[in-house]
């Protein structure tokens, strides 16, 4: 019987595969976020006309999902392997199935289903056509063709493939609890993450200072606005991410009502939309440097008319 891939070997296998498909291997972005989609490597690069192919691991924090390390499959923080390709290759689904084969999962020997699940992120004004990928009855991946990001229509269309690494590893290693996953030879997932899971859950549900978080949200929102007034897209977006994580902490604490919740989401969305518009305008000002010369000249000429 062949040795099962460790968690880090799964990551390395996916990195090698998508590198061979022309993706840049980016590193996780150093700001809290609820999903890999919120990284600037996806959110910003999915808009505008320039091509973009990238793959990266993104630790994703969802305070309300914390379970003190007691639930085998529900986590405060999990890991996503994110692939974004713009324009979307016509064979992206075939490439995805090929990536599963590299992980030792033969699509012909398993029940792999693409279940329609159109995606929406209200806090960033983003939406797209999507599918969940189910492997023998368990969701392991989200597939999305972005139609709108930051309130802007996407053209060309960006394809996003988001692997849930913990679920994938649980399946490959045949374990029932994420904490029993082998991260590396001789080191289990729980030996690294169960204590942080407990502590972050306790903080999110019991200890966090609600007044401080409410004040921080207002300050982060204001600072994002100040940065945008100066045309500073990336610092502004960092503060949008901080607003989002702060809201998630408030939500986990039960500190916002249903009505207030909608208001906070709208405030984050409004900022994200301004960031998106400012980013596209800045790329245009720079002459769309990632485009080939012919396409760049054509687009800039059209914009000048």
Curated annotation (Swiss-Prot):
It comes from Streptococcus pneumoniae (strain Hungary19A-6). The keyword Iron does not apply. It catalyses: tRNA(Gly) + glycine + ATP = glycyl-tRNA(Gly) + AMP + diphosphate. This is Glycine--tRNA ligase alpha subunit. The keyword Cell membrane does not apply. Its EC number is 6.1.1.14. Tetramer of two alpha and two beta subunits. Belongs to the class-II aminoacyl-tRNA synthetase family. Its main location: cytoplasm. Gene3D superfamilies: Bira Bifunctional Protein, Domain 2, Class II aaRS and biotin synthetases, domain 2. CDD domains: GlyRS_alpha_core. Pfam families: tRNA-synt_2e. It is an enzyme of class 6 (ligase). Keywords: Aminoacyl-tRNA synthetase, ATP-binding, Cytoplasm, Ligase, Nucleotide-binding, Protein biosynthesis. It comes from the Bacteria. HAMAP family: Gly_tRNA_synth_alpha. It is found in: Cytoplasm. One of its GO terms (biological process) is glycyl-tRNA aminoacylation. The lineage of its organism: Bacteria, Bacillati, Bacillota, Bacilli, Lactobacillales. NCBIfam families: glyQ (TIGR00388), PRK09348.1 (NF006827). GO terms for cellular component: cytosol. GO terms for molecular function: ATP binding; catalytic activity, acting on a protein; glycine-tRNA ligase activity; transferase activity.
């Amino acid at each position: 019987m062949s040795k099962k891939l460790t968690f880090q070997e799964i990551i390395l296998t996916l990195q090698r595969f998508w590198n061979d498909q022309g993706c840049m291997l980016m590193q996780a972005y150093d700001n809290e976020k609820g999903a890999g989609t919120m990284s600037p490597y996806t959110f910003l690069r999915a808009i505008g006309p320039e091509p973009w192919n990238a793959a990266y691991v993104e630790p994703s924090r969802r305070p309300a999902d914390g379970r003190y390390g007691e639930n085998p499959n529900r986590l405060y923080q999990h890991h996503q392997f994110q692939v974004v390709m713009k324009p979307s290759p016509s064979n992206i689904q075939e490439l995805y199935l090929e990536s599963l084969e590299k992980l030792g999962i033969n699509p012909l020997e398993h029940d792999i289903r693409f279940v329609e699940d159109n995606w929406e992120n209200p806090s960033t004004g983003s939406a797209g056509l999507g599918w969940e990928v189910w492997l023998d009855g368990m969701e392991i991946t989200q597939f999305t063709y972005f139609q709108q990001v930051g309130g802007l229509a996407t053209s060309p269309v960006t394809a996003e493939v988001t692997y849930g690494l913990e679920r994938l590893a649980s399946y490959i290693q045949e374990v029932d609890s994420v904490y029993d996953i082998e991260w590396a030879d001789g080191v289990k997932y729980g030996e690294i993450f169960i204590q942080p899971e407990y502590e972050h859950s306790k903080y999110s549900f019991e200890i966090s200072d609600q007044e401080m978080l409410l004040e921080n949200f207002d300050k982060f929102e204001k600072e994002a606005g100040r940065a945008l007034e100066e045309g500073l897209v990336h610092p502004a977006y960092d503060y949008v991410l901080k607003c989002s994580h702060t809201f998630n902490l408030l939500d986990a604490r039960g500190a916002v009502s249903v009505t207030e919740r909608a208001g906070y989401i709208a405030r984050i969305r409004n900022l994200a939309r301004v960031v998106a518009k400012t980013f596209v305008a800045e790329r245009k000002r720079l002459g769309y440097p990632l485009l080939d010369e012919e396409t760049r000249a054509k687009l800039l000429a059209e914009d000048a008319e």
